[in-house]
């Protein structure tokens, strides 16, 4: 008699995805972040659900409802800070996951990579609308500034902005619809994750060597379930240290002041995980140009498979491209720092250099390095 998990239609799908899945035997800890992202998503949906039970999406009561959650709801403070810091952990895992994809050439699995880019954009949209909900100063002004960017679109821009606002400024209608978006988007993300996994399991995972691993596969369970469990425990430990000891370290103090349309904060800035994109946006003096650069800073990931001319898969045996990769990472960290600084010299100059370098490394330098690497054997 065959085992139930191999026969039952539903269990069979789970079995092929998480139990008997043939997995390369040499994938390193950098491959843990996919499962960690799944865990982050579950934490965010669960904590978000409980927050939504007590939150009111009305301009007059939104701020006080968040205060009420923290003060009066049983473990409300824990749920709220798990949700806020869970988002930060989500983005840390996302950036590492994408970085690993670039380093090891996983972008050559085209469908998986493109769905991944859509997932990244959807998660960023979810985080943005979620940041508006507590209705603090930075929520309000962040929403005003970022939605206002759409007015840079020629001809239809201003109409589009007023349509999204539901009026002539960020107000009650905006908050209500942002809450609706913030509620529905994580479920859309979950559906996209399933498609992401579907495409991944069509081809099988990439591995650190960049070679075909069909000759050396092991079952996912118990080897990688145990390995993922260790990653999950480390992530939970870091998250709980953040939540219990430093809950506000990644937040903005301005968000403890209720939203006031008549008083602009000294420095309007988004959450830390958007600062690199914000720096790119600010580094271009033209409004439309800035918006395009902001969008392209994420969409540039889609050009990686097109620009790849290397004969090798991944950067593991390509020292020149490796050096460029780490310069690119350092450059993004620099831009993250610049995005949080005021708009004055020398920060504006550093921001502009970092922005230009980020695009140049991917579009110009990496393809050149690949060509050099391809021709090195010919030089001997």
UniProtKB/Swiss-Prot annotation:
Keyword set, alphabetical order: Electron transport, Heme, Iron, Membrane, Metal-binding, Mitochondrion, Mitochondrion inner membrane, Respiratory chain, Transmembrane, Transmembrane helix, Transport, Ubiquinone
PROSITE patterns recorded: CYTB_CTER (PS51003), CYTB_NTER (PS51002)
Binding of a ubiquinone, residues: 201
Residues the record lists as binding heme b b562: 83, 182
Statement: the UniProt record of this protein carries the keyword Iron: yes
InterPro entries registered for this protein in UniProt: Cyt_b/b6_C, Cyt_b/b6_C_sf, Cyt_b/b6_N, Cytb/b6-like_sf, Cytochrome_b, Cytochrome_b_C_euk/bac, Cytochrome_b_N_euk/bac, Di-haem_cyt_TM
One GO BP: mitochondrial electron transport, ubiquinol to cytochrome c
GO MF entries: metal ion binding; ubiquinol-cytochrome-c reductase activity
UniProt family annotation: Belongs to the cytochrome b family.
Name of protein: Cytochrome b
Origin species: Rhipidomys wetzeli (Wetzel's climbing mouse)
